[in-house]
């Protein structure tokens, strides 16, 4: 049974699963150890997302959507920022894009932020498994109320933020310098996300 996200999962079975994964010979001719382990991790993220349904959207964007967004932006080199980074899929695909085009992973610098603590930890693990260095801040936090990268000017902003959020606003944000084009409507965060993206572009 699919119980990846269930609190009652048997810790002994989980330990055995990790032992099994640890014993896999990561010596593929085509893929390095980090790539194989990363694919295993991505598989479980996908399975977890499927079992959780709509609720999983807070941390998981389908790989096909992520690939399309990255291919459109073509982040060959520079600073890549995702203010609602979920489990870090945008960063993984950006790094894959760079290496697929003859570059090196460190041709891009990765910056992100995630609101949910558990999802922030998923992102850190996802990137660590793949050897991708990233600055996701020292904690999970709200990009609107506590921007962890206030001075960042990125070459690329790539994100799938939570759309149509109605409770994003507070009076503390009224005169925020990010609202160059006017204060976004309090009842819908979409325009706030767009202005947040523009604010962080170089």
Give short role names for the model-derived ranges.
Residues 55-159, 164-168, 173-175:
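Conserved S-adenosyl-L-methionine
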Residues 11, 151, 187-191:
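Short, solvent-exposed loop/helix junctions and linker helices
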Residues 201-202:
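Helix-to-beta-strand junctions that scaffold the AdoMet/dcAdoMet cofactor pocket
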Residues 51, 105-106, 179-180:
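A short, mixed-charge helix-start or loop-turn motif at secondary-structure junctions
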Residues 16, 55-58, 112, 182-186:
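Alpha-helix N-cap/helix-initiation motif
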